[in-house]
């Protein structure tokens, strides 16, 4: 699988290309008198060192690019690696089944849980089918149906957030996009079950918040959470999307900044080079965080859960 190096990763890409070239030569001609193993190992160590150096000083815009990386693991990838016995549940029982939202019942280390998450696509047809991870009202109403089911059967709710935002099309607005999001915000704050939310990629505005009101809110190290995209902000303030890097820095969209503002609980570290470099390792780290969060919440009664969740929602936008 191609790593799809980003612009700021080009020095790493060049080193990796040299490693691949030397490795290929070594495999194709085993009769070479020159042993390339030492050189390959040296370059690999240099690549790790360079990656560590570059990723130790990333700007907000570079983090935004990583959050959108085409190989970044999505909700279904984490479901595959973290949970067992997943049974997807479809439809909002009113209009349609929105593929931009996936959800269902599964087991986390043997414990039954309800999972809801945004789902983007990788190939062109899947991207269109998933609407690029931008849910319509029926997607949020499907999510609400699963939340209510989880509450009825006392299943902890785990959500994965990864969306540019709610779909802004005319049809979505006609079917009540804002009402669907608002309804979810209200009902999530009232759920009588533990709710753990994790931003795994992009956390775009109300489209993210509609499944993001939790007792614990986490972000992966290279994910983002914001009221608008950097490009959208730049277009409004400077009339040019080219100012997106400047907007990203000003908006405070990164996990460490949001942790500093007490808008999230935990920053979950990613493997060196971001989550797509080592999906199993990323999934293992995320699983450990989910288990720890549920253990913390198990000691709280329903009223305590509701109060802290509601207070978190009310604190958004206030410093």
UniProtKB/Swiss-Prot annotation:
Domain named CoA carboxyltransferase C-terminal: which ranges?
Answer: 35-296
What are the transmembrane regions? none
Q: Which GO terms describe its biological process?
A: fatty acid biosynthetic process; malonyl-CoA biosynthetic process
Catalytic activity as recorded in UniProt: N(6)-carboxybiotinyl-L-lysyl-[protein] + acetyl-CoA = N(6)-biotinyl-L-lysyl-[protein] + malonyl-CoA
User: Pfam families this protein is in?
Assistant: ACCA
* Alphabetically ordered keywords of this record: ATP-binding, Cytoplasm, Fatty acid biosynthesis, Fatty acid metabolism, Lipid biosynthesis, Lipid metabolism, Nucleotide-binding, Transferase
Q: In which pathway does it act?
A: Lipid metabolism; malonyl-CoA biosynthesis; malonyl-CoA from acetyl-CoA: step 1/1
Give me the Gene Ontology terms describing cellular component: acetyl-CoA carboxylase complex
* Signal sequence range: none
Compartmental location: Cytoplasm
E.C. number, please?
2.1.3.15
Alphabetized InterPro entries for the sequence: Acetyl_CoA_COase_a_su, ClpP/crotonase-like_dom_sf, COA_CT_C
Q: Which family does it belong to?
A: Belongs to the AccA family.
Q: Which NCBIfam families match?
A: accA, AccA_sub, PRK05724.1
How the protein assembles, per its UniProt entry?
A: Acetyl-CoA carboxylase is a heterohexamer composed of biotin carboxyl carrier protein (AccB), biotin carboxylase (AccC) and two subunits each of ACCase subunit alpha (AccA) and ACCase subunit beta (AccD).
**Briefly, what is this protein's role?**
Component of the acetyl coenzyme A carboxylase (ACC) complex. First, biotin carboxylase catalyzes the carboxylation of biotin on its carrier protein (BCCP) and then the CO(2) group is transferred by the carboxyltransferase to acetyl-CoA to form malonyl-CoA.
HAMAP family recorded for this chain?
A: AcetylCoA_CT_alpha
Name assigned to this protein: Acetyl-coenzyme A carboxylase carboxyl transferase subunit alpha
Q: Give the originating organism.
A: Serratia proteamaculans (strain 568)
Q: What is the taxonomic lineage of the source species?
A: Bacteria, Pseudomonadati, Pseudomonadota, Gammaproteobacteria, Enterobacterales
């Amino acid at each position: 699988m191609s790593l799809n190096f980003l612009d700021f990763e080009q020095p790493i890409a060049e080193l990796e290309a040299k490693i691949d070239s030397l490795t290929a030569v070594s495999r194709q001609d085993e009769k070479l008198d020159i042993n390339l193993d030492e050189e390959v190992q040296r370059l690999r160590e240099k690549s790790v060192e360079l990656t560590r150096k570059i990723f130790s000083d990333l700007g907000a815009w570079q983090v935004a690019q990583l959050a959108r990386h085409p190989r970044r693991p999505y909700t279904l990838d984490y479901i595959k690696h973290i949970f067992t016995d997943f049974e997807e549940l479809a439809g909002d029982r009113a209009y349609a089944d929105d593929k931009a939202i996936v959800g269902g019942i599964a087991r986390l280390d043997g414990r039954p849980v309800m999972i809801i998450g945004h789902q983007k696509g990788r190939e062109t047809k899947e991207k269109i089918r998933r609407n690029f991870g931008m849910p319509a009202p029926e997607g949020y109403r499907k999510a609400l149906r699963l939340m209510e089911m989880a509450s009825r059967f006392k299943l902890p709710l785990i959500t994965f957030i990864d969306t540019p935002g709610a779909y802004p099309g005319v049809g979505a607005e006609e079917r009540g996009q804002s009402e669907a999001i608002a309804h979810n915000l209200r009902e999530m704050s009232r759920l009588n079950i533990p709710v753990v939310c994790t931003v795994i990629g992009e956390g775009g505005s109300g489209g993210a918040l509609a499944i993001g009101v939790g007792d614990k809110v986490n972000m992966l190290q290279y994910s983002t959470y914001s009221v608008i995209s950097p490009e959208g902000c730049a277009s409004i303030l400077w009339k040019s999307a080219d100012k997106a890097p400047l907007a990203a820095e000003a908006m405070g969209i990164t996990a460490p900044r949001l942790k500093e503002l007490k808008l999230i609980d935990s920053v979950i570290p990613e493997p060196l080079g971001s989550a797509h470099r080592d999906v199993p390792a990323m999934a293992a780290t995320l699983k450990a965080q989910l288990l720890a969060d549920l253990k913390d919440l198990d000691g709280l009664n329903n009223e305590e859960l509701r109060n802290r969740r509601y207070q978190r929602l009310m604190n958004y936008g206030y410093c």
